[in-house]
Amino acid sequence: MCRCSADSSPVDVKDILNRLKSLSAAEEFFEALGVPYDPKVLDVSRLHIMKRMGQYLAAEDFSHLPDRVIAARARAILERAYCDFATSAPLSHRVFKVLKDHNPNRPVTPGRTVVPLDSFLKPFEKK
């Protein structure tokens, strides 16, 4: 279960968007926004969480909002993105194009040839 924002740390809201833009590590985002996290979840899903956070942020309009409101929304968005992956496997969300395009339940497209790897290795097998 995800932790709620009541468990979070205080946040320095001054110029929060510019500060977020300068961050690179997922842990830095969690620290800057005061969002608690489980390192095990972040180790497995960090790219997915950050990608999802970016998708959620892109849908927001922060123009003309005070920094405290922007910080609160960014914190809520990061919590939401984290919770998406804290309770289910990253593959189930398919946030990256390569995962969206690959559906293991879909049959092979007609006209595409699948060559098993074994067929390449047979000439190299020791006799």
Curated annotation (Swiss-Prot):
The GO annotation for biological process reads: nitrogen fixation
Q: Which UniProt keywords apply?
A: Nitrogen fixation, Plasmid
Q: What does this protein do?
A: May protect the nitrogenase Fe-Mo protein from oxidative damage.
Protein's organism: Rhizobium etli (strain ATCC 51251 / DSM 11541 / JCM 21823 / NBRC 15573 / CFN 42)
The answer on whether this UniProt entry bears the keyword Nucleotide-binding reads: no
Q: Which InterPro entries match?
A: NifW (IPR004893)
Record family assignment: Belongs to the NifW family.
Q: What is this protein called?
A: Nitrogenase-stabilizing/protective protein NifW
Q: Does the keyword Plastid apply?
A: no
Oligomer status and interactors? Homotrimer; associates with NifD.
List, alphabetically, the Pfam families matched: NifW
- The source's superkingdom equals Bacteria
